[in-house]
Amino acid sequence: MKKLYTIVSLMLSSLSIMATDFKDCSMAIKSNISTNIEKSNTTVFINRNTFSINGLKYDNTDLGNVELTNLQVINGYSDGTMVYATSEPQYITIGGEKVAANFRGEVRKSKFRGILNLTVNGSNYIAMIGDKADELGQLPNAGFENFHDASETSDTKEPNGWHSFKTCAGSLSGTAGKANNTFIESKEKHSGTNCVKVQSDILSVLGFIKQPANGTMTTGRLYAGSTTANNTANNSTMDFAATDKDGNGDPFYPIFTTKPDAMTVWVKFKGNVKDYPNATVNAILANDKVQDPEKDDYKKNVIARATNATIESKNFAWQELNIPFEYANKNTPKGMLVTISTNAKAGKASSDKKNLDVIYVDDIAMIYNSSLKSAQYKNTNLSFADNKAAIEIEGKANEADFSIASDGEGAYISKVLKTNEGETGKSTLYITITSNDLQKSNCFEVAITDKTATGIFNIKSDSNATSSTLYNLAGQQVSNSYKGIIIKNGKKYINK
């Protein structure tokens, strides 16, 4: 097994937070070179925008102490949560080796959780630190297993992290709050124990007017401010400055600072309005206050959107939706406003009390890409087989000579060039593409031969070249049966 160099130390704490120890944090380290998962408890130390951890181990190997500095601090949440992240790969020397590291973590309610992702010589290690660190980059309660009372005076259940009209605000909240929209569902779930059932309702307005109301839930807070259904005063809002708490003691917003490429969600839908047959799922990534339907005042805060407003019943069977995010800019998000409704049109719910619109929702997942989209050395395209490629160049290569692109919107790309020990004119470029949630990485290697040092000529990109590949003095690849002077691993031999 390769010698393991690992680091865990990164970010945390803003200039407003004092140096803090977080003791007895659970930790699990996994690697792409072994199926073993090393579990232990550890202490992390946070001082302003520096994160450090001591005494790391993997497979009974001491990994030492690590520290990362100059971390990005994301704050401004009314509940005091602090999020810390590397904005790009940081390069650290561990055991004499250059290591590429990425980190993301948060301090919330005096508890720490985070993910450290590092690569050394093509080997990738991921340390999950703290309770539910693997849920970073996902919405809370994404499987809809946990519910709470909407309020002290209501027995209506809301999924943890989600909110219905029972907790709405606005001038008409008294009327809208009579709607029963969300229910625990244990029989019709897609997986696990529960899912959520969202159902439309018919409200009594002024005691005698019957008004159909869409069944709606949101990660923000619903507002009822107009009798005109499509008025933007009727909306879902995400406001990080709002101090109100829901029935579970959580704010009316989710903390979400990553950049997913798509969102998948399982739904089972039945609409009962012929002219308005579609349900909708809409997600907005933002770094400040936003609402849905959007208002011009807040559009500048939008970073990305993911929308499906054409959800069909499809025989009332479970279906998986895959909704891509479209990014408007490169800003860092602070939260995600997700709104799910039984009808894509405001105020177009079923007027039949016996046939209300209903959508079951389960298993929401954020998808993060980390595949290689393209790779070039100057103007030469690189072709990879089994994540390896080989090129021959004139002179020594530089990391800046290589252009790497990923299919991940927020994927982190690191490049580490290393001279091969004992091999004249040979070096290896280690490329790592890490998903924005830091939970998966793809590692690539480029074997580089400096032909001016070895006598090899003719630049080419060869995805099949290995350490045993033979060349003649013209730089042509030859077989073992070739007679004459050959070059192997940068050294010349006479093959008889």
Question: In which residue ranges do the predicted regions lie?
Answer:
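Bacterial Sec-dependent N-terminal signal peptides
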Residues: 1-24
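Beta-sheet ligand-binding and adhesion/scaffold domains
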Residues: 79-135, 218-234
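Aromatic (Trp/Tyr/Phe) and Gly/Pro-enriched flexible surface segments
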Residues: 127-260, 277-287, 291-322, 326-327, ...
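Extended, low-complexity, turn-rich repeat/linker tracts enriched in Gly/Pro/Ser/Thr and Asp/Glu
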Residues: 59-61, 269-277, 289-292
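Beta-rich interaction/scaffold domains
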Residues: 369-453
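Central antiparallel beta-sheet cores of small beta-barrel/beta-sandwich binding domains
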Residues: 36-98
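Residue-level detector of functionally pivotal "anchor" positions at catalytic/ligand-binding pockets or at interdomain
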Residues: 369-374, 449-474
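Edge beta-strand at a domain terminus
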Residues: 19-31, 38-41, 63-77, 111-139, ...
